[in-house]
Amino acid sequence: MHVTHLSLADFRSYARVEVPLDPGVTAFVGPNGQGKTNLVEAVGYLATLGSHRVSSDAPLVRMGAERAIIRAQVRQDERRQLVELELNPGKANRARINRSSQVRPRDVLGIVRTVLFAPEDLALIKGDPGERRRFLDELITARSPRMAGVRSDYERVLKQRNTLLKTAALARRHGGRSMDLSTLDVWDQHLARAGAELLAQRLDLIAALQPLADKAYEQLAPGGGPIALEYKPSAPGEAHTRDALYEQLMAALAEARKQEIERGVTLVGPQRDELLLKLGQLPAKGYASHGESWSYALALRLASYDLLRAEGNEPVLVLDDVFAELDTRRRERLAELVAPGEQVLVTAAVDDDVPGVLAGTRYTVSEGTVERV
């Protein structure tokens, strides 16, 4: 699969831009702040319905514009598709496939798939647990786009349940009459049902990712491993099947109910779980050096790419200003590993930041203009 044409309107710094794209390597080169990352950010948005740089859509819309449009022509084997997203901050986003009538934005998931390497990837190792949960859940959705709906359902139920718990906590704190919490039983069931499906997918993903990540780390840092991915659930137990995970979550919710009512928040579930990344016998966070942390983060991304490729539709590889962050050895090794990709999009401030093995199409990006060299 590869993107053959990218069109943006009022996205970030671009009033309008059209960029033809080839298979193989394409590099966007230009000084920082000129808009090169905006291009690959748009491709990534089509794949995840989110940005790797900001948490909301508002910064993605050009100043003074009401909405932004991302449009891409995609080719997979002999099949061609046109996918379009309209970003409307404060309102519902819109989507179209092949200029048809409007579809839900999440219906476009799976048409474009990406694996993104970026300076922010260090947060996978050094950041808080939310960074690692996001990594898992975005990859789960790339493997199975229907999981976007499951994640949305879980977040909706969690929000409703937290509202109920907060109201109960405030009532108790101010000496008010005790609330009828019978509806909490219903929310527990909904939360456990969606949570169990999400947990089952996370556990399956980790099992599939572990050998690939260990292999990738050895390729990047020979003799530096092994590495291990260990899931730490907030609901104690050893369950792996969806039904067993449902029962495990229900038991944990029952056990935590008194404390949850006191604190006014849900204390167990996927939103509280942790992915522990180990280097040797120690947690990478706090123990891995800067170079080891980079190798670990790159290994996770390479493993993601290998997994998606093995399961069918090869993703677009996006390397956003990542080579400037790496020492010479890691830079050369990473370039060798990604060079055979069906489509590889690279951004760099200067030509020298693009390894020679990644020779291909070049664009210069300056002051909002994108020109092929």
Curated annotation (Swiss-Prot):
GO cellular component, one term: cytoplasm
Residues that hold ATP according to the record: G30, P31, N32, G33, Q34, G35, K36, T37
Coiled coil, from the record: none
GO MF annotations in UniProt: ATP binding; single-stranded DNA binding
An annotated GO BP: SOS response
Keywords for the protein's UniProt record, in alphabetical order: ATP-binding, Cytoplasm, DNA damage, DNA repair, DNA replication, DNA-binding, Nucleotide-binding, SOS response
Major site of localization recorded for this protein: cytoplasm
Localization, UniProt: Cytoplasm
CDD domains the record matches: ABC_RecF
Pfam families reported for this sequence: SMC_N
Function: The RecF protein is involved in DNA metabolism; it is required for DNA replication and normal SOS inducibility. RecF binds preferentially to single-stranded, linear DNA. It also seems to bind ATP.
Family listed: Belongs to the RecF family.
PANTHER family per UniProt: DNA REPLICATION AND REPAIR PROTEIN RECF
Protein's UniProt name: DNA replication and repair protein RecF
Taxonomic lineage: Bacteria, Bacillati, Actinomycetota, Actinomycetes, Kitasatosporales
